Structures are given as C-alpha cells and as structure tokens.
UniProtKB/Swiss-Prot annotation:
Chief place where the protein resides: nucleus
Lineage: Eukaryota, Viridiplantae, Chlorophyta, core chlorophytes, Chlorophyceae
Gene Ontology molecular function terms on file: DNA binding; protein heterodimerization activity; structural constituent of chromatin
PANTHER family linked to this entry: HISTONE H2A (PTHR23430)
Role this protein plays: Core component of nucleosome. Nucleosomes wrap and compact DNA into chromatin, limiting DNA accessibility to the cellular machineries which require DNA as a template. Histones thereby play a central role in transcription regulation, DNA repair, DNA replication and chromosomal stability. DNA accessibility is regulated via a complex set of post-translational modifications of histones, also called histone code, and nucleosome remodeling.
Protein known as: Histone H2A-III
One cellular-component annotation, GO: nucleosome
Organism of provenance: Volvox carteri (Green alga)
SMART domains in the cross-refs: H2A
Amino acid sequence: MAGRGKGKTAGKKAVSRSAKAGLQFPVGRIARYLKKGKYAERIGAGAPVYLAAVLEYLTAEVLELAGNAARDNKKNRIVPRHIQLAIRNDEELGKLLGDVTIASGGVLPNIHAVLLPKKSKGGKGEEAA
C-alpha cells in the first residue's frame, strides 16, 4: 500500500480557506484574482484572507444600511435607490464612495435653505395689532 497516504489523514475532507477564516467571501477566488491581476510579483498567504474579510465587512455594512432604508420606505426588496440612500446618508461610506455612481440610484432629497419659505418672526399677537 505504498503511496496511498498516511491512513488517518487520507479520509479527511478538504476545508476551504474561507471556512477556516470563518468568512462567506471566497478566499481562493480572491487569491486567484490577485495573482492573475499582476498587482505584485508575489502574493502573501494572508493577503487574500484579509482582503476577503474587508470586502465582506463593507458588503455587510452597506446591506444593513440599505435594508434599513428599504424598511423605512415600507419595502421588502432592496433596490439601487435604497443602496444610494444608505451610502449617501452615512458619513464614512459617503466619503469612501463619493466618486461612485450607482445606476438607478437617484439623488438625495435636498432643498437649499434659501429656497425654503421664510419663517414669520411674530406670532398671532402682531397680526392683530
């Protein structure tokens, strides 16, 4: 039985790097993209894991805020408009994605202060006098 493995380890099930890191995003695919993209001559073993974790965190953050925006509008489905509202209303995400255009996102509702009707300074007492 030479060349058949070590017996106990031969029956082990393969565990993905995503599962080892406790991530949903594919670490192997991100590693492949990093290598294929020629960003550097060599890619460290931890780089794709870290990048997958960062991407997963940012995605979860945007999805949570977009879900809140959808719920505020009494909708069950997240559409690009909800993603736009979520990103633009959040200070840090707005800064990170300031130059990004979201298709079918629309614009933030905003009326310039000069265009708003003037507030009357006096109450009902001045009108009678």
